[in-house]
């Protein structure tokens, strides 16, 4: 059997994936509260101001998922960091205090009830803070979630949904390899009109074919 290259599964090219903490409540509140459009693109519930109770409820939901995590950017590093003088009261052997990663969003894979878990299906949920949208972080996080689902959690199928008016989202998911599986016609009320709910999915074999995943024999697909 060919050996596999060990790597940190909680890192992608530009992102760090970390657990949800109680200290994230303010951040979780902000990613929905900063933009009403972002809130309505991420949830179908009637728009209401998001307070601390909503943030705690969202954190509780993430903690109950198959996996629910905070998406972060790593702290910046510069050559100057390596040459900074030792702070008073420390020795040259003392590790400098590193800045914390910057949270930019949340991602989850839904957990199935025990009596239907044998189907090995899950759904992606993702939200990127408005200031970090349009930079490819959402795509990178979804690709990370797909790899985790298929390679580590042995999922058979991953689905994702988007509201019909959010054309940029569902077209992006199609480019990532999700297959357009159907629409729930006029299922969503938004801004004075009814809109479709677009349903997309990806099978494990489709992911392997598109992304050259590592199979059980340790070789690339």
What residues fall within each predicted segment?
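Conserved acetyl-CoA-binding loop-helix of GNAT-fold acetyltransferases
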Residues: 128, 134-151, 167-175
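Acetyl-CoA-dependent GNAT
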Residues: 44-133, 203-205, 218-221
